[in-house]
Amino acid sequence: MKKIALFLFLLNSAFLFAQKEVSGVVKDKSGNPLPGVNIVEKGTSNGVSTDFEGGFRIKVKDGATLVFSYVGFSTVEKATSGEKISVILDESGGQILSDVVVVGSRSAKRTVVDSAVPIDVINVKDVTTQSGKLEINELLQYAAPSFNANKQSGSDGADHVDPASLRGMGPDQTLVLINGKRRHQSSLINLFGTRGRGNTGTDLNAIPAASIKRIEILRDGAAAQYGSDAIAGVINIVTNDNVKEFTGAITYGAFNTDAKGDFPEGTANTKGYRLDQKGFGNSFGKNQDFDGGSVKVAANYGVPVGTKGGYVNVTGEFLNKNKTLRPGFDFRKGFGEAEMKGVNLFVNFAVPIADKTELYVFGGSNFRDTDAYAFTRNDGERVVEEIYPGGYTPRITSKINDNSVAAGIRTESGGGWKFDFSNTLGKNKFSYDIKGTLNASLEEKSPTEFDAGGHSLLQNTTNFDVSKNYGDILGGLNLAFGTEFRIEKFEIFAGEEGSYATYDTNGVPITDPTTQSAPTIPNPDYDPADPDSSPTISRPGGSQGFPGYSPANEVNKNRTNFSLYTDAELDITQSLMVSGAVRYENYSDFGSTVNGKLASRLKITDKINLRGSVSTGFRAPSLAQIYYNLRFTNFSSGGATEVLLAPNDSEITRAFGIQKLNEEKALNASLGFTANFGDFTATVDGYLINVKDRIVLTGYFDATALGTNVDKAQFFVNGVDTKTTGLDVVVSWKKNINENRFSAALVGNINDMKIDKIKNGSLPANTFFGERDKAFLLASAPPNKFALNLNYGRKWFDAGLAFTRFSEVKLLDYQMDEDPEDYRTSPTETDAQVFENQKRAATDTYGAKIVTDLTLGFKLSKSTKLSIGANNLLNIYPDQQDDWVEAGGYWDAVQMGFNGAYYYARLGFNF
């Protein structure tokens, strides 16, 4: 690899390459500044947007031409003869904003408008200044029609890392790129009480929003272009490269604690019964009108490096969020969002080292310290009164480290061939500390805090990409090919002994249940007439709230992946473009796969384009899905009861007839159109996603017959085939009238997923993947979501009003786990009728809701702006449910979430 890099350097060292910085102002014919004008160096993907005052700075090659485009205005091309440019845009003959994109096409000239596949381009600076959203997942939840993410509660690790998805697919079925380079996933696998259970995803919140120029969302299958995971689409995050500009903001906000609902007297976190966070999680303290207070401080600054257009751009971000507490049942007094303290640093660097040759480095470090309440222990064998009189609510705290760095060389030969050689290293480490807890088998001698171990994932990716544009072949041919080599390593590391062990009455870890026994307490439900009833109950071991990983759980596994791809786009005429891609992948642990893609765009008129694509795709099983395991032991007078989430390569897994995990296989198709009528633009795209062999997590199987001292077993399996159809809609309008700027956008997604097949083989279907599991999978996204965004601005003031409608969502609660006979209403009912009774009782229906966001912005000076506003202004909550809800509160984590109205103020600056 070093020889290749040296060869590329020597190949181009003879050429001298000069860049310069050009700045200026863009105005309309009346002299009003135009913010958000798209500016692109012609023939490249190098581009910026104008700021609030219409100003811009951009680094370009000598002699470059800049293209200025803005919705409702004529596009203007301007040569960069000097360092200062003044541009006047004419409202006649308006054109659609044509963002040049990196994702979805390897052509440096392809824009959103003329792409053959749907792409959203989100200007993060605009979104962050026009809303109170603090993290990337929150921003995208309301800015992108098919993106969905929600804060979780009572879901162990998922309380600390939000699961997110595109088009209702799994969190691991969307590929994330940073500046076109593959981003590593989180080491966390979602297991309990959350969407995306059995999946790993990429933690977008580990990337500071202030470091991002724009986010490109390719809403189409792209495994043939980018490899594994790109079944639902690709999210490419393009980071800032501006210089001589110091920007940032200080934001403070808090949530309204007045949760709307009809709650019984004494309900935790209602008036007079707010959980006292200074106690053990089982006593009440003072009322609060607001909670979840958050402070975010972010800054971004870039400086030139050398005199030929080099730069280093640095972002720092600090975010502190307190817990929210919402009405919960007696067994979940700490229902609400986790507390979080986070520090983010990101650096983007590039410098020319020869003619048309650039060295680049980018990467960041994110650290988060999080704290979430688990379920409450009120009494019984899990409570030691000497430590926690009256019970306690344990806290699951975590330390999350996310680090990444990418480095590479980009160059262009004299013949127009472009080469990009890079290496990207990323690692996520997730450590658990359980606080306010105990190991009940140690009784009053138990510590109240344990190191419970954790897990990590390392990914190293090496890429070599080549491309060339042939302008003389028909309307233009862009040819690209390349290779990728990836190494992945997954680890589970054990916690301290007390976090996982069960101790006998002498305080010695139990290794032989025939000679050792755990401490017991009297069984309050003992029935002498019942031969299965015991007069005593054994105290369980391990840290309450989250049992630690033991040495038996430890894993240190790795694999490699090698891929080759080719990608071509041909403009047959000015109206017709076709593209195709083929990619070969070989994994060291499961074998190889080949995938392809065809796409086309037809200009029906100057204003309307028709586009469509069809592709095959795949997702390799993650190392976590193959090797993750949990093993914990319950002891009673009758002996040991062991429960195991078995790794895919275990003997127990094979004994149940469950096969080695294979890749998920997908077929994607899309058809849509774009329309541009000056001030008005629209895109509508329908899609089909068929996925075979989706990897899911089974229910608990009886394993006592295996003779392996395991009583219950659970597995990852290629268990489900799904079919998803849907429609994405984006309609926008912009108009400038004198000094007034008006804009409106309607974005929406309609999504329908069906389960075609449950691949349970000879195993009982309801245990393999039961009704509750199906409901959680199908509710990964609301059946439809629409948002109407209205904006107004002038020199010193701007305002935004947004309405987001979430459709009805249905889930099945814990009543599906009860004895079906409890739901028999007549002795003559059939089992099928009883089942329907139970399912009807277990159905939690969340009716459609509309959420309103409002923001007001005031220019205090040329460099400072004050914004105030509210997310969920009218304090809307999902419909209230009963005490069978998964998370122990009165709502699941659906639609707009369970936190209510959020009010904020932000002071932004730009020097």
Segments predicted by a language model, with ranges:
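Short acidic/polar hinge/loop motifs at secondary-structure boundaries
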Residues: F56-K59, K181-R219, G266-A268, G279
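Extracytoplasmic beta-strand/coil segments of soluble accessory domains associated
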Residues: R57-K59, N137-S186, G233
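N-terminal periplasmic accessory domains that precede
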Residues: E83-D90, I136-L139, A143, D162-A164, ...
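Transmembrane beta-barrel wall of Gram-negative outer-membrane proteins
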Residues: K244-T247, N269-A374, E385, P394-G408, ...
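Short, acidic, small-residue-rich periplasmic hinge/interaction motif at the N-terminus
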Residues: K27-K42, T65-F73, G82-T129
